Amino acid sequence: MNTPLPPGLAQIWVDADACPAVIRDILFRAAQRTGIPVTLVANHFLRTPTLAHVRALQVPGGPDAADDAIAERVNAGDLVVTQDIPLAARVLERGAAAVSPRGEPFSSDSIAERLSVRGFLEELRGAGVATGGPPALHARDRQAFAAQLDRWLARQSARS
């Protein structure tokens, strides 16, 4: 569903190219329960449930296309779900909140360090050092994500 959303209404943006299905399911349930709009952004087709508050935005392929689409559309007060540290930095600058699918909140206090670590790991990979990927998503990660989402939703309820 791609109906326009009312201006000024906080919403959740999902960098869906790498968002685990179990996290998307948590977001779908939250949208159904609370009426908060959830927009999944990806450079490929995404099957979404037919819920009034859930929509998918497919962007052209290419590096950072989904990230750019989110960064251009996000507003202060929105929540962005991403594991992409540069995207998290961009949305924090716009006054939005950002959280990883593991429930790790990004903050203006920690983002510079995270960008630095990311840059260092990229240098290692460029030099041929195997740095490995992220560990598998565990139940504790899902619980941490759900807890962060509930905190953000509670703040939205307090504002309205």
From Swiss-Prot:
Q: Which organism is it from?
A: Xanthomonas campestris pv. campestris (strain ATCC 33913 / DSM 3586 / NCPPB 528 / LMG 568 / P 25)
Q: What is this protein called?
A: UPF0178 protein XCC2288
Q: Name the source's superkingdom.
A: Bacteria
What family does this chain come from, according to its entry? Answer: Belongs to the UPF0178 family.
Q: What InterPro entries does UniProt report for this protein, alphabetically?
A: UPF0178
